[in-house]
C-alpha cells in the first residue's frame, strides 16, 4: 500500500533508515535504486528541455498546486508542516453545491513561518531548475484555505483557516439568540425527514436515527459522520440507496454554525446555510439577523486579517527565485 501510516516498520520517517535501504545487496536496494534512477533520468530530461527552450528564446512556465498528496513523501518526511486532521477544498459555488473536497492535508502555517517557510522555498528553488515562470494554483490558499474535517465527504461544514471565529457575544450582538446545541448539531425533525427522504422516511428513522425528544431525532453513532455513511453505502448503487445516502449527508450538514477548529468557544456561520432546512425553520426575523451576520463574516470581517496572513508568506517566497510569478484562482 502507498498509505505510509499503514506500514508496520516505516510509518514514521527515520533518516537512519536511508543508508541501509540504499545499500547494495539489501532486500530493498534494487527497488530503491530503481526509483533513484527514474528521478535522475527525469532531472536530466527536464534540464535538457529547459536549456533547449531557453536557447531558442522560449520561456517555460510550470505549475505549483497549493496542496500535496496526504500519502506523499512530503507528508511522510516532514509531517510537522501539515495538519492531518483536516482536508483542503473549496466552498460551494454555482458549479458545485456541496463544495469541493480535494482530500489533501492543510498546512501548519505557524510551524512553517517559524523557519522562514523553508519547505516552500525548497519547492520553488527546485522548480526553478526547470522553469522560468510558475503559476500558483489556488493562490488564495496563502491567504486562507477552506479546511474540512477529515470525517467529511462534502465541503459544507468546512471553515476558512485561518479565520476569525465569532464568540457567543459577537453572534448575539446581531440580535440572534445563540442556542449552541440547536445551531451547531444536525437539526433533524420529523418534517425534515419527510421532506428529505419521502417514501423512505420510516425506513430511515428505523435504521439510521434515534429519537431524542418530541419530534426531534439524532443520527445513530454508527452513522453520525459523512465518512461513516460513505462506508455504510460502499458498493450500493441503486437509485434508492443513493437517495438515502445523499439525504443522510445533508442531515450531517444541516447546521447554522460550525465550531472553530482551534477554539471550541468560537464559531463560524455555515457556508450557504441559507439553503439548508435548519435555516428554513427560523423565524423571518432571525433569518434577517443571521443574513446580516453571515454577510459581515464572509465579506468583511476577515479581509484585513487574511491580507496580513498572506504577507507573512508570499513576499519571502516570491523572492526565493528569479522565476516570474503568476497567480490563479477561481471561486470564493
Language-model segments: residues:
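Catalytic cores of glycan-processing enzymes that make or break glycosidic bonds
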Residues: 1-332
